[in-house]
């Protein structure tokens, strides 16, 4: 249930449509399997496969963007096109020109698409109107951009903006390491990436390695800055903070797993309980992290 990544966004103005209103908007852009000739299709799908495009618990909402893509490697298309071009050359007595090659490639693609395998990828979105958060469970900015574009397409006048803080993650993480003092409520874990600002981009990584304060200060004095830092919030949630303010490898710790209601036996109730727990914990963590980065800066 828990998101593994958090690409963070803020509501720049109050936004409080009901789950039913959001459902109606998403329904206009719902996912449908692609035809045999479509390379890729996207649309909103049910997070619980129960037909509902918005899974709501209280004011918290969970959405799912589904992407279906045909697996048709360019090397396969190019090989078949090359063979087809050789046949055409033999028939007409001269090599096909650029336009003819382009048409051959399009023809080959159309012939191969119906036989190509399809893969589906679901990307989840958590919306917390009360605390003003919208987070996308995507490891890369490119995938998050896809989701954001579909959100803007489906939800009119969505007041969405990136999170801006008063102290950059790089400056803050570097300061925490150089002073050997983590912000209140957080601890630094045994994974760090330090990178030089020079053209060489010289990089030092610590992975599951004890951190030596003097060694870290030496790297920082030499001009390196922290670009990735593994941390734990209140002994409850571990994560990796990056220089772009994306949060990766989010994981609940044992204290949260023990807190989960073990008396819930119904699968739907369990899902709702887990979602509520995740939303509450992440909202608290994000609030504290924002403060640790100097507070939110209004763009």
Curated annotation (Swiss-Prot):
Do you know which InterPro entries this protein is assigned to?
RdgC
Gene Ontology MF annotations: double-stranded DNA binding
* NCBIfam families per the UniProt record, alphabetical: PRK00321.1-4, PRK00321.1-5
Similarity-based family: Belongs to the RdgC family.
Q: Quick check: keyword Secreted in the entry? A: no
Where is it mostly found?
cytoplasm
Which species is this record about?
Cupriavidus pinatubonensis (strain JMP 134 / LMG 1197)
Q: Give yes or no: UniProt keyword Nucleus.
A: no
Its domain of life reads Bacteria
Q: Which PANTHER family match?
A: RECOMBINATION-ASSOCIATED PROTEIN RDGC (PTHR38103:SF1)
Checking Pfam families in the record gives:
RdgC
List GO terms (cellular component aspect): bacterial nucleoid; cytoplasm
Q: Where in the cell is it found?
A: Cytoplasm, Nucleoid
* GO BP term, example: DNA recombination
Q: Tell me the protein's name.
A: Recombination-associated protein RdgC
Q: What does this protein do?
A: May be involved in recombination.
């Amino acid at each position: 249930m828990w998101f593994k990544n958090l690409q963070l966004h803020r509501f720049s103005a109050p936004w409080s449509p009901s789950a039913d209103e959001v459902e109606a908007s998403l329904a206009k852009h719902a996912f449908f399997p692609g035809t045999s000739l479509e390379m890729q299709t996207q649309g909103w799908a049910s997070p619980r496969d129960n037909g509902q495009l918005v899974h709501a618990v209280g004011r918290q909402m969970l959405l799912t963007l589904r992407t279906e893509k045909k697996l048709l490697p360019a090397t396969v298309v190019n090989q078949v096109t090359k063979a087809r071009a050789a046949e055409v050359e033999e028939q007409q007595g001269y090599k096909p020109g650029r336009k003819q090659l382009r048409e051959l490639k399009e023809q080959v693609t159309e012939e191969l698409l119906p036989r190509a395998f399809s893969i589906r990828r679901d990307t989840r979105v958590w919306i917390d109107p009360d605390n003003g958060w919208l987070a996308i469970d995507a490891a890369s900015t490119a995938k998050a951009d896809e989701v954001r574009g579909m959100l803007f397409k489906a939800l009119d006048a969505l007041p969405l903006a990136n999170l801006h803080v008063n102290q950059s993650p790089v400056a803050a993480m570097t300061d925490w390491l150089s002073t050997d003092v983590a912000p209140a409520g957080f601890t630094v874990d045994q994974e760090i990436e330090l990178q030089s600002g020079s053209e060489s981009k010289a990089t030092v990584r610590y992975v599951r390695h004890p951190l030596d304060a003097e060694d870290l200060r030496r790297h920082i004095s030499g001009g390196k800055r922290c670009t990735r830092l593994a941390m734990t919030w209140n002994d409850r949630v571990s994560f990796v903070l990056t220089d772009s303010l994306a949060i990766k490898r989010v994981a609940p710790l044992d204290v949260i797993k023990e807190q989960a209601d073990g008396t819930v036996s119904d699968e739907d109730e369990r899902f709702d309980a887990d979602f509520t727990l995740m939303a509450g914990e992440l909202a608290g963590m994000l609030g504290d992290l924002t403060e640790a980065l100097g507070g939110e800066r209004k763009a």
